A protein has these predicted regions:
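Condensing-enzyme catalytic core mediating Claisen C-C bond formation in acyl metabolism
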Residues: 1-47, 147-205, 209, 213, ...
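Buried hydrophobic positions in well-ordered alpha/beta secondary-structure cores of metabolic enzymes
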Residues: 9-11, 60, 71-74, 92, ...
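A structural motif shared across PLP-dependent enzymes of the aminotransferase-like
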Residues: 18-29, 51, 80-91
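Membrane helical hairpin/interfacial module
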Residues: 68-94, 99-102
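Short beta-strand segments
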Residues: 77, 133-139, 162, 174, ...
Length: 344
């Protein structure tokens, strides 16, 4: 899908809690041998997907420096909202001063909800319905203690302030391509606390099939090849999968490394690929092309192609500071902060 009207990123932001638990600490408790990430982010006792989304969206708004009343949409993608019935988007919109005249909605498509939010906001702008819009991906990822996901399920948020005022944009969205199938690789039924997954089924039939399908689809439709991109950001459930996907598609490791942050913060689910994009935008130079490919279980992938403008680099997010600001906790404190310890 090529946007018929130019849509740009005026501002962007990210939030990562400063608590960390090391993979070796999780292995110590559960006698695991594999550590898919070095460490992962852990939310504070007063943090959840809603509060993290507020922080990321506030940073994007401040970078964009737009009037709050001109932001016409706020789409929040997450699979871990704090309320089963009550939208996060209205709370965030109120906290940011966007209410009452704003389209605000919660969205869910596992780990690709954030990129889908961005595509829909871009569509509203390109269609002339709104001037500016916010797309947010945020998650406090859940995992059963001792499960494979317990090693990687992190916490974080990222936000994009999209606009038709492209002369001030740091990057322009050129193309978007979505690829979905009914693939039951990961799910959580109503009333269940933790998600379930078919571990071996999450690789080839799910992650790689959809990532490759979306990336190839966009490149074929737009006439691009891997060498046309300076950076590529894949959804990152662990460190290995994005590197393998890059190899399968013909990308080089140096195109992937900058946006690969899961080794430091774990899998932040709906925020994962967007946090990777934030890091790339913080370091990119004008005229560089970026490919972002998300993945959400169930299953599907969004591929988004962007090109940076001369404005990139003039302002940067707080991501590098957040990545370096760490307080390590042991497994007991981690379990307490994640709400894994229940008192009868």
């Amino acid at each position: 899908m090529k946007l018929t009207t130019s849509v740009g990123i005026l501002g962007y932001g990210a939030y990562v809690p400063f608590y960390r638990v090391k993979g070796s600490e999780i292995s110590r408790i559960w006698s695991g041998e594999d550590e898919p990430v070095r460490e992962k982010s852990v939310p504070g006792l007063d943090e959840d997907s809603l509060t993290m989304a507020c922080e990321a969206a506030r940073e994007a708004l401040e970078m964009a420096n737009v009037k709050r009343e001109e932001v016409g949409a706020l789409l929040v993608g997450s699979e871990s909202p704090p309320y089963a019935v009550k939208p996060s988007a209205t709370v965030i919109a109120e906290a940011l001063g966007l209410t009452p005249r704003v389209v605000a909605i919660d969205m869910e498509f596992a780990c690709k909800a954030g990129t889908t939010a961005a595509i829909l906001v871009a569509g509203l702008i390109a269609g002339g319905a709104i001037k500016h819009g916010l797309a947010v991906g945020t998650d406090n990822a859940q995992a059963r203690p001792g499960d494979e996901l317990d090693y990687t399920a992190g916490a974080g948020a990222a936000a994009l302030l999209l606009s038709r005022e492209v002369e001030s944009a740091v990057a322009l969205i050129e193309y978007a391509y979505s690829y979905v199938t009914d693939t039951p690789d990961f799910w959580r039924r109503e009333g269940e606390r933790f998600p379930r997954h078919t571990f071996r089924f999450t690789g080839a039939p799910a992650y790689f099939h959809h990532i490759v399908g979306a990336a190839k689809g966009l490149m074929e439709e737009a006439g691009f090849k891997p060498s046309d991109f300076d950076y590529v950001v894949f959804h990152q459930p662990n460190v290995r999968f994005p590197l393998r996907a890059a190899q399968m598609l013909g990308f080089k490791e140096e195109q992937v490394k900058l946006g690969l942050v899961c080794g430091e913060i774990g899998n932040t689910y709906a925020a994962a690929s967007l946090i990777g994009l934030v890091r790339v935008l913080d370091h990119a130079r004008p005229g560089q092309r970026i490919l972002v490919v998300s993945f959400g279980s169930g299953a599907g992938s969004d591929a988004i192609c962007l090109v940076t403008t001369e404005n990139v680099g003039r302002k940067k997010s707080s991501l590098e500071r957040l990545l370096s600001k760490k307080v390590y906790v042991d497994y007991a404190q981690y379990a307490k902060q994640k709400g894994l310890l229940k008192v009868a």
